[in-house]
């Protein structure tokens, strides 16, 4: 408080000093203006002054007029006041007629005579009384004064019309001081102003106390500013641009062999954070539909850091070459699934091991959830392995499903209780322990799920047949991943889906047949996830426990993958996700690392005839399966 009062007193002293300077400035300005007006008056008087002879001439004329004499007499007033020619003996000029008229006007007064001195510089007027005659009686004469007004000169100047706003006088005076040309400042005043400025600049800044520093560091404004600024600085520092790149093609010629060798799959980025990713397993991946460069990854607990939060969700940015996550979210239970809220670009949804569903908002400065579902029997009580937002911009819901067989529908605005819930049960048996779920493109009612028992089920949310519809058997182990056909083209393949399992296989299915269409058996470990390309009808990807990523193009080959690559260190790959463009693919491993690969154009970009070719491939697969079933049927009787 003492610092504030001292600062306030210092400001008051400066204000008083400024007021004194302004008053002194105003007084000196008034003195200067007064001096200028006096000088102008003196100049006008000096201009009007005339020579002594001219003054005497005017006095003489006035005196003559007062005596009744007119200037029409033969006296000529020249430049040097030379009298008219006279005889050498004469010393005076008389006007008898005028004298007579004067006598007639006044009998007591004698005639008057005007006498001139021979010296033209001195004009002397002698009356008759000086010559021994009677005194002269003076009378009043009328003077007519005529004023001629000066000629009016009209001038025009161009101006810019601007709206006039009423402001306080103090503001106007300050603006005038700034805008109007300043009069020359006296050296003393200038020195005082400079001295004050130097004192202000040299004054040491106020040193904050530890309490004030902590208060600033923990303020919401500082945290928001620091978070935003560090994110921008990291992006700038992480950019790596090759300034020596040769556009003439020499660089490409040197690397032609490397480009052709790695054209199918090439490493793009790696995401790993020492604090939040280390010793954690990547449990789920999802790309943002609003911002295609953002990837959310969920992680389970870190057993070596018991004091850290069990569940973590990190948002990574593909656009900038920064090595730290864009956002860090966490909660008190391991996050088993995560997704971007499709129609809410700021929201991230997570499903936890405890059965809670949590909601994070990147507009909030908090890393903890802004909403969460209750831990009650009305919601989930088992781990939530699947969360998905389905619907349209104006009508959408969050769908969650857990290993207790319960599927819930939620509104993102209110997670206090589900809008709808249903238990998935097949033929009055126990509930299905769901491990994976997928919706066909454009469908919000029908979906497929994989279970811990190795069976696949089709189900629907609404209608008379709500619940489990059909069961598909073929896997010999728990289902780890399931995905419906997502590529939209000339032919509709939405009835197809692929599954992965602990039985080391990937299988292709159709909802029209409860037996697998084809089984891909090229892996030698658990296959943890599988997903179809969003743009290519015959392309899908899968990952296994040996750290291998396989890309299968069924139009090229159904026996071996079209492209394969192993992650360095061969960690188990838990999750795989295509970008929305289908040009990159992300994989997450058991050590908390996420690797992004670029997919070659010859694989990722479909040609116009890919849908027709895939139709023929399916026909061949169905024919081969029919032949195999017929051959198996003939073997049984034998």
UniProtKB/Swiss-Prot annotation:
Disordered: region residues: 1-135, 154-209
GO CC field: centrosome; cytoplasmic dynein complex; dynein complex; microtubule; outer dynein arm; vesicle
Family according to the record: Belongs to the dynein intermediate chain family.
Taxonomic lineage: Eukaryota, Metazoa, Chordata, Craniata, Vertebrata
Positions of modified residues (Phosphothreonine): 95
Pfam families given in the database record: Dynein_IC2, WD40
Location in or out of the cell: Cytoplasm, Cytoskeleton; Cytoplasm
Annotated positions of the Diphosphoserine modification: 51
Modified residues (Phosphoserine): 51, 90, 97, 101, 104
Processing and modification events after translation: The phosphorylation status of Ser-90 appears to be involved in dynactin-dependent target binding. Pyrophosphorylation by 5-diphosphoinositol pentakisphosphate (5-IP7) promotes interaction with DCTN1. Serine pyrophosphorylation is achieved by Mg(2+)-dependent, but enzyme independent transfer of a beta-phosphate from a inositol pyrophosphate to a pre-phosphorylated serine residue.
Main function: Acts as one of several non-catalytic accessory components of the cytoplasmic dynein 1 complex that are thought to be involved in linking dynein to cargos and to adapter proteins that regulate dynein function. Cytoplasmic dynein 1 acts as a motor for the intracellular retrograde motility of vesicles and organelles along microtubules. The intermediate chains mediate the binding of dynein to dynactin via its 150 kDa component (p150-glued) DCTN1. Involved in membrane-transport, such as Golgi apparatus, late endosomes and lysosomes.
Organism, as annotated: Rattus norvegicus
Record GO terms (molecular function): dynein heavy chain binding; dynein light chain binding; protein-containing complex binding
Chain positions with N-acetylserine modification: 2
WD repeats: 277-326, 330-370, 379-420, 429-469, 474-519, 568-607
Composition skew (Low complexity), residue ranges: 88-97
Name used for this protein in its record: Cytoplasmic dynein 1 intermediate chain 2
Keyword annotations from UniProtKB, A to Z: Acetylation, Cytoplasm, Cytoskeleton, Dynein, Microtubule, Motor protein, Phosphoprotein, Repeat, Transport, WD repeat
Feature: compositional bias, Basic and acidic residues: 1-13, 20-43, 190-209
Tissue: Skeletal muscle, testis, kidney, brain, heart and spleen.
Subunit details: Homodimer. The cytoplasmic dynein 1 complex consists of two catalytic heavy chains (HCs) and a number of non-catalytic subunits presented by intermediate chains (ICs), light intermediate chains (LICs) and light chains (LCs); the composition seems to vary in respect to the IC, LIC and LC composition. The heavy chain homodimer serves as a scaffold for the probable homodimeric assembly of the respective non-catalytic subunits. The ICs and LICs bind directly to the HC dimer and the LCs assemble on the IC dimer. Interacts with DYNLT3. Interacts with DYNLT1.
Region called Interaction with DYNLT1, residue ranges: 133-165
């Amino acid at each position: 408080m003492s610092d504030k009062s001292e600062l306030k007193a210092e400001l008051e002293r400066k204000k008083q000093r400024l007021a004194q300077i302004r008053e002194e400035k105003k007084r000196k300005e008034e003195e200067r203006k007064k001096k200028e007006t006096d000088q102008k008056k003196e100049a006008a008087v000096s201009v009007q002054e005339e020579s002594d002879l001219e003054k005497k001439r005017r006095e003489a004329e006035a005196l003559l007029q007062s005596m009744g004499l007119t200037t029409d007499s033969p006296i000529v007033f020249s430049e040097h006041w030379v009298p008219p020619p006279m005889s050498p003996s004469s010393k005076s000029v008389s006007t008898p007629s005028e004298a007579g008229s004067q006598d007639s006007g006044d009998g007591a007064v004698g005639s008057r005579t005007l006498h001139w001195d021979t010296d033209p510089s001195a004009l002397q007027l002698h009356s008759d009384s000086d010559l021994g005659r009677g005194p002269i009686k003076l009378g009043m004469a009328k003077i007519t004064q005529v004023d001629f007004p000066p000629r009016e000169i009209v001038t025009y100047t161009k101006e810019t019309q601007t709206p006039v706003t009423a402001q306080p006088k103090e503001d106007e005076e300050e603006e005038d001081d700034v805008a109007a040309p300043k009069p020359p400042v006296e050296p003393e005043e200038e020195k005082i102003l400079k001295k004050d400025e130097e004192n202000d600049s040299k004054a040491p800044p106020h040193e904050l106390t530890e309490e004030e520093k902590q208060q600033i560091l923990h303020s919401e404004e500082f945290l928001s500013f620091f978070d935003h600024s560090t994110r921008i600085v990291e992006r700038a520092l992480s950019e790596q641009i090759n300034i020596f790149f040769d556009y003439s093609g020499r660089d490409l010629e040197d690397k032609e062999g490397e480009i052709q060798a790695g054209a199918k799959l090439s490493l793009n980025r790696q995401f790993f954070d020492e604090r939040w990713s280390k010793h954690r397993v990547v449990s789920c991946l999802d790309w943002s539909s609003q911002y295609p460069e953002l990837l959310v990854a969920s992680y389970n607990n870190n057993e070596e850091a018991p004091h850290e939060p069990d569940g973590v969700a990190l948002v990574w940015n593909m656009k900038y070459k920064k090595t730290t996550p864009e956002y860090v979210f966490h909660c008190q239970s391991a996050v088993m699934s995560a997704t971007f809220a499709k129609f809410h670009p700021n929201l991230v949804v997570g499903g936890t091991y405890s059965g809670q569903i949590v909601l994070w908002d990147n507009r909030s400065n908090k890393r903890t959830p802004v909403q969460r579902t209750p831990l009650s029997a009305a919601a989930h009580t088992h781990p939530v392995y699947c969360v998905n937002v389905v619907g349209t911009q104006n009508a959408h819901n969050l769908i969650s499903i857990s290993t207790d067989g319960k599927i819930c529908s939620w509104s993102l605005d209110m997670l206090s209780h589900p809008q709808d819930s249903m238990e998935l049960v097949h033929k009055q048996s126990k509930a299905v322990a769901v491990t994976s779920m997928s919706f066909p493109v454009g469908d919000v009612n029908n979906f497929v799920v994989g279970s811990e028992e190795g069976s696949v089920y089709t189900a629907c949310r609404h209608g008379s047949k709500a619940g489990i519809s059909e069961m598909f058997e073929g896997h010999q182990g728990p289902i780890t991943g399931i995905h419906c056909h997502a590529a939209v083209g000339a032919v509709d393949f939405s009835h197809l889906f692929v599954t992965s399992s602990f039985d080391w296989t990937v299988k292709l299915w159709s909802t029209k047949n409860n037996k697998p269409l084809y089984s891909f058996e090229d892996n030698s470990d658990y296959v943890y996830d599988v997903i179809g390309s969003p743009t290519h009808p015959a392309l899908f990807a899968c990952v296994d426990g040996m750290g291998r990523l396989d890309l299968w193009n069924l139009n090229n080959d159904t026996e071996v993958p079209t492209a394969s690559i192993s992650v360095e260190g061969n960690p188990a790959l838990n999750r795989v996700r295509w970008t929305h463009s289908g040009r990159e693919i992300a994989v997450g491993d058991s050590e908390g690392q996420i690797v992004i690969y670029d997919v070659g154009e010859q694989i990722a970009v479909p040609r116009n005839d890919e849908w027709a070719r895939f139709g023929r491939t399916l026909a061949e697969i169905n024919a081969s399966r029919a032949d195999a079933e017929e051959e198996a049927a003939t073997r049984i009787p034998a």
